[in-house]
Structures are given as structure tokens and as C-alpha cells.
């Protein structure tokens, strides 16, 4: 038997996993006294975490001539040469990064591709700048977006880039064929067609006006690397098994050892003649928050480490010659409940599970593994969120969980499950934070509403396949959005048409509200609609929000060309083309 402290004292709880083992929880972070979680407004919370509030995109001009624009490092006289050693998750679920939703894909693949337009890595992605398109025009009615392509750009297989490749790439992203699921497709639901007036011009035509900042940011997403039309045609528009997808980016693949290292080299015929500065990159597969990742960067076996644990970040901060930063991740850490299976087709049961979770304890569980913050269904650091001081007065988010547990028990009884539920399949993604949270929530369910779960830990490829197919009762993991705007993730995460609605949740009133949110231009009216949608989710949750993530990155200061201090997420600026090494 093991002892777990869940607020009101110590209780006995038998933990069960798929092997039937009994593991002690003694020594896990939640077995001790929980530190009080910081309270305050969203801006205050950001300051207390050492984070800057997330800033909006810079204004986007309706007409931009970037025919002479060439991206370069922000520092004067950057040096060419050297190989960057990067520690990052590089455990791909498959090779089709358009279909992916994990840094395990894009973190190592992004450097091989270019975008149509991109987020500027020099200002943490706040400005939209040219990429394969050097210039653009946005019609006054905000319904036609025209892009003018560079000439002389070649793919890594020697083929010339044309507008047909851009069209084929975005046609697949916007309207994936059968058997293909792309998490960002929902961003382009207002795009009625993509046309190519000539070999080097591409137009996105919208069925209704949308804000240029929304559409341009959607197009510029780091996930939207351009691939060849022929590559798509040759592989029936599904690139999951294509290990070397030709790209136009600054690097190309040289060697890959599964789950160990992926070696890239500089592409000598890259269209930007001054880039890249590096001769190559070695991506070492190291798990986020792991002691192995921390050890690798602290011992200088890698130059840069993505997503380190807080202990490593603190050590790096006090080590001469090292730098670290923290920024908000574009991800929700959640537990999905399979609405296609009983008893989860009952909103009362879903809300009971929602209320059975003590989110302040969940944050404390991983305080030395992964820095997190309490939040609901909306990015807590965004302008659209319920202010934190108000959120913490809401049942399910209060410091004292007594009221939440009382309501959860009553809901289970009303739904006919007053005696609990046994034998639920709880699928866990194989990362330290998810394993810790799953054990904590397993204990909370058992103690608070007499629900017993069997934990099943799986790697990314299995997790995403089983989540998509519904092969689970509960599953814990993380999903990503592209934008802070709810019109992105409300559609992608919480609607049946969304590619990341892993709970298979469908609420007609919510769907109607999101349609209104998408088209409402008055900020005050739009925010009121968002509040109504939030209230629906509180009563009928599409996912159980666990918490929201903060990223700590660590690097040696001889690495230059890098400005991570105001990132929102880590997917839009993952190309390393302006990185350089200031070594003798």
C-alpha cells in the first residue's frame, strides 16, 4: 500500500498499473507539504514567474515589397563555420511534420524547410517577414492575400520551387485528404481556394473577411514548411513514412540514428547566400525535463538544450558562460476523457472528473521537473483569459478543494455512479511530467470519487495513434496551438471538426458560439462570447485542463543569433538559420 497526501490528510491508496505492480508514491513531490501557489492577475502572475506578458504581433502592412530583404543575424560580423550540438526531443511519431503536434518532429526537421512567410527569429517571432515569398499584397476587403515568390530557389533534390508547390502544400494543410490529419487545418477554414496566377504568384482567397493578423500568422506558422507537389503526389499525399522529404531550407539531412542523433549539414546552394552560418547541426535525442538533458548541457556535451528542468535552469543561471530563459509554451497539458464510451457520454461524469482534480497540487507535483501554472480552458497569460484572481475563486480552481470534491461526489451519485467506477484504461505519454501527473490524478480519482484506473505508458507514436482512434478511457498528454486567439484552439481542440478533439466532444451551443467568435469584430462583444463559451466548457468539459507550461532553455553564451526572451511557444522560430558560434 502507498500513502498519498491529497490536501485533507494521508489516506491509503492502492496504485495499479498494467503490470499489476504496487509502486510506492513515497518521496514524490505531492507527498510533502504543498507550497502555496502564487495568485494575482495575469500580468502579475507573469511577473512572478519571471515571464513577460505575451505581446501581440507587430502591425502587418497591406502591401510589402521585400524584394531586397535578406535575413541576417542581429549581431554585427557573425562568424561562419562550426557545428551546433543541440539537445532536444527528436523521437518522431512519424516523418510528416505537417501531421504532427510535437516538438519531437519540428525541433529537428524545421531546419530543412522554408515557409511562405515567417516569424522573425530576431524579435522572438513578433514580426511577420518574407521567406520564400519576398513580397505580399492584402486586398482592402481582407479576402484576397497575394504572395510573390523568389526565383531560383531549389529543393534539396535539385528541383526548382514554383507556385504549384506552395499551392499543393497549403491545399493539403487547409483541406487534408482522407487518412491525413493536420492540426493546423482549422486555421484555414475561411480559405475557399488557393490559386496560382503564374509560376511565381500564389493567392489565398477567403470566403469571408478575416483579420490580416490572424491569416498572416496562420500562414507563417513554423509548422507550414513548403514541400514539393511531386513528393506529395508520389506518396499519395501522406508523408508519414518518407524519411527524407525534400525541402528548400538551409540544412539537409546527412545521417540519422533512430532515437539517438540526427545530423544535418549546410545546404551550399541555399537561396539566402549569407545563410546559414553554421556548417551543420547535430540533434541529440534527449527527453524534455530529464536529468540526462540537464547533464548534457551543464557538462558542455551539447551547446544548447531545449526544455530543461528547473534545477538545471537554476544551475545554468549561476554558471559563468551560460544563459537561460523562460517563456510561455503554446500548449495545454490535459487529460482527455473518451466521450464515445460510457460513462463519459454524461456531462455530469465529465464535470465530476474535472472537479476531482486538485490543480494546485498538480502544479506542485512537477515543480522540480517542469514549471507549470494553474489555468482553465483558455491560455491563462492571454488577454482573453479570466483573470487569475477571479479564476481561483471558481470551483475546481480554488486553493481549498472541499467544495469541488463535494460537488463531484454529488454529480457521480446523480449520474448513477455513487459507488464509483473500476478498471479504466488511462493512457500516459512517456514523459516524466505526464507520468507524475497520471499517478497523482489516479490517486485523486480513487480518494475523491472512488474511481480506479490502470495506467498504460506509451511512446509518442502509440499515444497519438491511440488518441486519434479513441483507444483509451482517459489519456494524458499535451497538444499545441498556433495562435493565442481562441478562434484557433477553440476550433482545433474543442470542436468535432477539430483535429485535436481527442475526447470526441460535441456541444452544439459551444459550436454556435465559436462560429460567432470567429466573425465578431467588436472586441468587447467578442470577449463576452468567449466568456459564454468558457462557461459551457466548465459545465461540460471537453478536456480536463491539468496546467499550462513554461519552458526553460539553456545554452552556452558563445552561441549567438538567438533571441528567445519573448517567445510564445517554440514552434515558429525553430530553424537555426541565423545561429552562429562565437568561438576562436
Predicted regions: what they are:
Residues 1-36, 43-47, 57:
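N-terminal secretory signal peptides
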Residues 72, 77, 363, 376, ...:
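Extracytoplasmic/peripheral linker and loop segments enriched in polar/acidic and small residues
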Residues 113-123, 219-276, 280, 291, ...:
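Gly/Pro-rich hinge or "lid" segments in bacterial periplasmic/extracellular proteins
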Residues 148, 184-232:
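Surface-exposed binding/hinge segments that line
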Residues 150, 269-315, 450, 454:
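Ligand-site clamp/hinge motif
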